[in-house]
Swiss-Prot record:
It comes from Bradyrhizobium diazoefficiens (strain JCM 10833 / BCRC 13528 / IAM 13628 / NBRC 14792 / USDA 110). It is an enzyme of class 7 (translocase). GO terms for cellular component: plasma membrane. InterPro entries: CcO_II (IPR045187), CcO_II-like_C (IPR002429), Copper_CuA (IPR001505), Cupredoxin (IPR008972), Cyt_c_oxidase_su2_TM_sf (IPR036257). It holds the Pfam family COX2. It catalyses: 4 Fe(II)-[cytochrome c] + O2 + 8 H(+)(in) = 4 Fe(III)-[cytochrome c] + 2 H2O + 4 H(+)(out). This is Alternative cytochrome c oxidase subunit 2.
């Protein structure tokens, strides 16, 4: 009886904790509310199954507890029950998988009018590259990476000369405009993650991965690295500032281009803070 009561309390407590938990999503700041919807669908389906299984276990513990003289019935198979379980499991998996596939298709289908922005991760800083007045990014190659050219831009590509390069600073984006985020890594796995954006993707050395977003709320948002990348992983912080388009262009006008930076002799790098400073 006590075991049945404990199981019942676990089921009720788990559901109540989920419904009234103080730890919930941050307010969304992009178009990816669909991702929240798919997570909610998964929570409801798995929560229903969890509750049903726990309540069934509690019922069995109470209904079929040990009694003197009672003998358990031996039933090696039950085809009817097996069919019901198979169909129910299939429906549940399909109900979770189908919305995810629909959202994934939207996630990787970038609008034709999206502006490309490149983000590079390295131990332990973020670098950003935005298109200049020509509206397109120049080509790049990892073989071009050097202290004077940390993002590996092709110096002979005219489209890259007006690219805006920001090292270890903040990224600005205009509100309401689709942005294709190109992701690269210099050294190890990183993951550019802004909780309010919902969208994220691993950054893999030697590959260019991507996702796209449309910011729907102005504000300043924290950037985190969601992939353990070394001793100073915690230092991979930055800000994304979503602002009105006029403010964005005013900020962009104040930034230095690759052509203006390529002649310098030194580049400021992120340093590991040992705690002795």
């Amino acid at each position: 009886m006590a075991v049945a009561l404990i199981l019942l309390l676990i089921a009720i407590g788990s559901v109540l904790f989920h419904l009234f938990s103080p730890w919930w999503w941050t307010p969304i700041a992009t178009n990816w509310g669909y991702i929240d919807d798919t997570i909610n669908i998964t929570f409801w389906i798995t929560g229903f199954v969890f509750t049903a299984v726990i309540l069934f276990m509690a019922y069995c513990v109470f209904r079929f507890h040990h009694k003197e003289g009672r003998q358990a019935a031996y039933n090696p198979e039950n085809k009817k029950l097996e069919w019901w379980l198979s169909v129910g499991t299939g429906v549940g998996v399909a109900a979770m998988l189908a919305p995810g596939l629909v959202v994934w298709h939207q996630f990787v289908t970038v609008p034709a009018d999206a502006t490309e922005v490149e983000i590079m991760g390295q131990q332990w800083q973020w670098s950003f590259r935005l298109p200049g007045k020509d509206g397109r990014l120049g080509t790049s190659d990892v073989r071009n990476i050097s202290p004077e050219n940390p993002m590996g831009l092709n110096r002979d590509d005219p489209h890259g000369q007006d690219d805006v390069v920001i090292e270890n600073g903040d990224l600005h984006l205009p509100i309401g405009k689709p942005v294709k985020v190109l992701l690269r890594s210099v050294d190890v796995l990183h993951d550019f993650y802004v909780p309010e954006f919902r969208a994220k993707m691993d950054m893999v050395p030697g590959m260019v991965t991507y996702f796209w977003i449309r910011p729907i709320r102005t504000g300043t948002f924290d950037v985190l690295c969601a992939e353990l990348c070394g001793a100073a992983h915690y230092q991979m912080r930055a800000k994304v500032i979503v602002e009105a388009e006029s403010d964005y262009h005013a900020w962009l006008e104040q930034q230095k281009t690759f052509a203006g930076l390529s002649g310098r002799n030194a580049v400021v790098r992120a340093k590991y803070n040992s705690g002795d400073d």
